[in-house]
């Protein structure tokens, strides 16, 4: 029913700041990403091709927007990270967006093999803001911890 773009950045006190933009449908997503990419320094665009986000791939390719495909395993890591960062480590900061607050309040998880994932099967509850925010925070943390010198022999 709706789609969300999640962004993550360095937040206050070493926390990860997450923000989302959510609108009905998916037609708006790629044009909005193109505008964001033109105006901001974006480290990466990522999506889970095993989800409804797969409908965006052809438009992303047509607009020459490079993206990182996230596996179900990576989405499980993002879910686990976000739960831990919110509940235990207090590592997430956000600006109090209604869509994200509602998604967090109503979200449930499920297991696929041994991975805990956000349960998106209930169409009456839109958790796309939470899925987008957790994916963005997970990828930000990985990129934040990456040292380019580690890849030089």
Regions found by a protein language model. Name each.
Residues 1-72, 76, 80, 84, ...:
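RNase H-like, metal-dependent nuclease domains and their acidic two-metal-ion catalytic environment used
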